[in-house]
Amino acid sequence: MASSHGPKKSLGQHWLKDPDILADIAEAAELTGDDVVLEIGPGLGTLTSRLLARANSVTAVEFDADLARKLPGQFPGKKLTVVNQDVLQFDLNQLPKNYKVVANVPYYITSKIVEKLMTAENKPSIAVLLVQKEVAERIAAEAGNMSVLSVSVQIFAEAELDIEVPRQFFTPPPKVDSQVVVLRTRNNPLITPEYQRDFFRIVKAGFSAKRKKLRSSLSGGLGIDKIVAEELLKNAGISPDARAEDLAIEDWRRLLKEWRAR
């Protein structure tokens, strides 16, 4: 039986079996009978069963060959496709438009998975991700607590925190608590593709020296004089004394506009 499969520490496996929490995660994806779901890391299939009950079909990408081999036999007659592959290598273009993602994400590849989903040509319409609580909070942060991660995600999607999952609900318990973050992909990113390179250069410069004021971090990160950095900020309606974490997405957009107008 699949349940006898012990979690592999090297793969960051932690089994979640609580039926109420699993139901809440599946519900967060707002599934209908027409939906195609990409499940990342199905593990023992405890969440898979709930997704199959709600969606049209599920494509489950599982890196662990032992688990991938066992999964299909657990759901005979169901529309389940199991792919034994590293999800970072999985071609999202195989999936139809407006597919949905549901995943209990291994902590060690969370940022890479989020980046893959948000920058893909074929993005999901919604991604429901169970991740480390601190990471979920960073992804969904607002002005005052922003980071490169939150800015990077929020130009592509609206981010909303959902249920918290304390560590004791996992086997074995991880060292930290988890939380569901729901990403609803924007029809159009807030920064168009041709400007994204400049945008991220500015954002990364702003966050390059977190404790410093923006005039200093932009000066160092962009290789410009502090006077020039201060002028850019003032023209964008931003206090030169502000710090990067204080800025909302709209502030960064105005700063990009001023940078390109130089």
Which sequence ranges carry the predicted segments?
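Catalytic cores of RNA-modifying enzymes
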Residues: 1-205, 227, 234, 245, ...
